[in-house]
């Protein structure tokens, strides 16, 4: 299977990095490599380091970017099979210690991951509950659904999925698993449908969409690793280097917005009448409001409707 994932906000994400001919850039979420391919076309002697924790994505990238991965290639691509929360240690291992010129994140889940039934991401295919981006980790969707407490389940469904029937769904999950384990995606879909009132199932898309999203976020600790990675990325940027982040969910965007605000504003310490002279912001926001997809892209790519791009520059 080949990646059919269509990159969202492609030009906006890369062009806002102000790519330098010989720059060093990090693609924190390589996926199908759409953003990386466009960035490589902008470089001459530069390097792109692509991170992905999904072994399948890395194996596909080795095929589709064979030329750029060859020793001595210019521009050069380096692939790293790891989570983007381990940026610094991997860069040090590669001998990079003087910073990077730019980094970007596309936080959408790649379409092929949903299209592989055995990955257990999708409510459209019947498969064992899994949802792990990194297939080597122990925690999976089956474990969460069958062992977490009713309160824990309710909390993640509400917090990560904005599911207003979170309590009803959590209660139904616990009741059902007392009878027998909830093993497959379709088992879980049936439980969710039973928990949601009939009137609510008739509108708003698939009734399991929000719950599946929430469980996926919990399985992969997506918000925790995002916050950790963004903090590290900002420290790794050289002065003038830029960071671009595409989000698709409100909880992701809130984290990006909060961290960008933290580093672009200087707080007056309590008890002091003014900002100390040596206190300076670390980032400059490229745009106060998030960059959204153009009308043309909205027509061509349905995924772009919820996409928000935020960009900042290291001072």
Curated annotation (Swiss-Prot):
Family matches, as SUPFAM superfamilies: Putative methyltransferase TM0872, insert domain, S-adenosyl-L-methionine-dependent methyltransferases
Record keywords, A-Z: Cytoplasm, Methyltransferase, rRNA processing, S-adenosyl-L-methionine, Transferase
EC number: 2.1.1.199
A GO biological-process term: rRNA base methylation
Catalyzed reactions: cytidine(1402) in 16S rRNA + S-adenosyl-L-methionine = N(4)-methylcytidine(1402) in 16S rRNA + S-adenosyl-L-homocysteine + H(+)
Localization per record: Cytoplasm
Source species, domain of life: Bacteria
GO cellular component: cytoplasm
A single MF term (Gene Ontology): rRNA (cytosine-N4-)-methyltransferase activity
Keyword field contains 4Fe-4S: no
Protein name: Ribosomal RNA small subunit methyltransferase H
Name of encoding gene: rsmH
